[in-house]
Amino acid sequence: MKTVTMKVTGLVQGVGFRWTTQMIAQDLGITGTVKNNPDGSVSIVAQGEELPLEHFIKKIKASPSVAGHVDHVDLNTVSDAEKFTRFSVVY
């Protein structure tokens, strides 16, 4: 099990980005959270097996929302993360 954090910038708020991120995560068996940040970016904590997590990251970088676009993803691996049981949108 691997955990990563992502800070996603671009047109990622107000375009269904969090909802589509949640749908992709659920389809791939990824757990964690996604939330909007005050600076217009989106933060994601994603946890899962190596291959599904790689697919998830690729889909995020390609922008899961057709109305939005991703300019940059700051990706970090977390070694001591809490265990998530589902993927949820944090409001």
UniProtKB/Swiss-Prot annotation:
Annotated Acylphosphatase-like domain residues: 3-91
Active site: 18, 36
Signal sequence coordinates: none
InterPro entries: Acylphosphatase, Acylphosphatase-like_dom, Acylphosphatase-like_dom_sf, Acylphosphatase_CS
Keywords linked to the UniProt accession: Hydrolase
E.C. designation(s): 3.6.1.7
Keyword Hydrolase: yes
Catalytic reaction list: an acyl phosphate + H2O = a carboxylate + phosphate + H(+)
Keyword hit for Lyase: no
Molecular function, one GO term: acylphosphatase activity
SUPFAM superfamilies: Acylphosphatase/BLUF domain-like
Pfam family, one: Acylphosphatase
Similarity remark: Belongs to the acylphosphatase family.
Full protein name: Acylphosphatase
Organism: Lactobacillus gasseri (strain ATCC 33323 / DSM 20243 / BCRC 14619 / CIP 102991 / JCM 1131 / KCTC 3163 / NCIMB 11718 / NCTC 13722 / AM63)
Gene (name only): acyP
